[in-house]
Amino acid sequence: MTARALHYVFKVANRAKTIDFFTNVLNMKVLRHEEFEKGCEATCNGPYNGRWSKTMIGYGSEDEHFVLEITYNYPIHKYELGNDYRAIVIDSDQLFEKVEKINHRKSGCGRLAVKDPDGHEFKIGKADQSPKVLRVQVNVGDLEKSKKYWNETLGMPIVEEKSSRIRMSYGDGQCELEIVKSQDKIDRKTGFGRIAFSYPEDKLESLQDKIKSANGTIINELTTLETPGKADVQVVILADPDEHEICFVGDEGFRALSKIDDKAESELKEQIKKDDSEKWI
């Protein structure tokens, strides 16, 4: 498959604290920010119908970097994390030295682990390079079943395979997906995330048909999503055997949508300042 790893979606309870963590601890930058008055037709913001926002944040343009999508539902101020998400791996000597000076734990692989305000873990390793998201790690219940889905059904090549974990990627230089065998049953709870990939627009329907033929799970069938003042995109939302959510979005539309917005950070700060949603509860 000709796919491109794009981003991982986090639902967050406190937008201000979250943005502070990603910009001041992990040195990321706000790339674009969008506000929506009603829930996403492809459940991009989770199973919620109210007002929400999307903030893309990362180390560079979405054409060249795997980034994060920060989803904030105005009426929701608490999520419960499950054991589906494991960590995101970022390597950079500069970032490693910075994290060494703050509260962290040492992971088994020698990286430094830190958590965002919602409890999502990030593992920071050493590398003579600018910070780059290398890998998304998720837990799975049945490694072989998960491998078959990602490698055979979704056509993601295997980079490295071990007895308890498998690394895969759609291409050199792309962010990898690492599936890790869990000893516990996977429970996604309310804080579950979603990983996104781009795919040629004219092949999205055939991908959907392939998933149907394989009796795979389709959360949202192929649909067009509108973003006020920006490009429309086509998406289909799938789920793997452990219900990890997967978005495939048309590459052409997404490249038009995902241009860096120089006004995004100031717009985000203004929306945070005006946010009185805690009073709604």
UniProtKB/Swiss-Prot annotation:
Pfam families (UniProt xref): GLOD4_C, Glyoxalase
Record-annotated disulphide pairs: none
Record's keyword annotation contains Repeat: yes
InterPro entries: GLOD4, GLOD4_C, Glyas_Bleomycin-R_OHBP_Dase, Glyas_Fos-R_dOase_dom, VOC
Keywords of this entry: Repeat
Highest taxon, organism lineage: Eukaryota
Matching CDD domains: GLOD4_C (cd16357)
Keyword set includes Repeat: yes
GO biological process annotation, one example: determination of adult lifespan
Ranges where the VOC domain occurs: 4-127, 132-251
Tissue expression summary: Expressed in the following tissues in both larvae and adults: pharynx, pharyngeal-intestinal valve, intestine, anal sphincter, vulval muscle, seam cells and the nervous system.
Function in brief: Thought to act as a glyoxalase. May remove methylglyoxal from mitochondrial proteins. Has roles in reducing oxidative stress and increasing lifespan.
Family that this chain belongs to: Belongs to the glyoxalase I family.
Protein name from the UniProt record: Glyoxalase 1
Organism of provenance: Caenorhabditis elegans
Organism classification: Eukaryota, Metazoa, Ecdysozoa, Nematoda, Chromadorea
Gene name for this UniProt entry: glod-4
